C-alpha cells in the first residue's frame, strides 16, 4: 500500500529525497548549508524541503545509522516530529557526539531520514484512578527505567 506525499523543493539545487534501496522505510534528507560542529555542538540545519504530511500520519526524522557510527552525528530530539499541519521547511537539530573531533556537514550531504507513519489520534479521557476505570493491574505496574533488569550486566 502506498500513500502520496506532497513535497515542495525549496532549494532546486538539491535532489528530491529518495530511498537508498527498494523497500527502505525512510527517505534521505539533504543539508542546504555547510555547517561545522565542534565536539558536543548542535545546530539547526535546513533541508530545503517542505512536506504536507496527510492527516492521521506523522513524519519522523531519524538519524542515519552510518553517520552515527562513523562520525558521531546524531539528532538532538530523535526522532524529530513533523505534524500533519506543519507546512514549513523541515529542519534537523544535529549534534556532534564525538568527544574529540569536529565534524563538517557540507551542502548536499545526506543528514537524516524521514519516515512517514500512521498515527492513532487518541482522545484523552480523564479518570480518577485506573482501578475505578476498570483498567486492571498489569504485571509491570508502574515499573520503568530499568525495571525489566539487565542493567547490571550491560
UniProtKB/Swiss-Prot annotation:
It catalyses: dUTP + H2O = dUMP + diphosphate + H(+). GO terms for biological process: dUMP biosynthetic process; dUTP catabolic process. Substrate binds at residues 64-66, 77, 81-83, 91. GO terms for molecular function: dUTP diphosphatase activity; magnesium ion binding. It comes from the Bacteria. Its EC number is 3.6.1.23. NCBIfam families: dut (TIGR00576), PRK00601.1 (NF001862). This enzyme is involved in nucleotide metabolism: it produces dUMP, the immediate precursor of thymidine nucleotides and it decreases the intracellular concentration of dUTP so that uracil cannot be incorporated into DNA. Belongs to the dUTPase family. This is Deoxyuridine 5'-triphosphate nucleotidohydrolase.
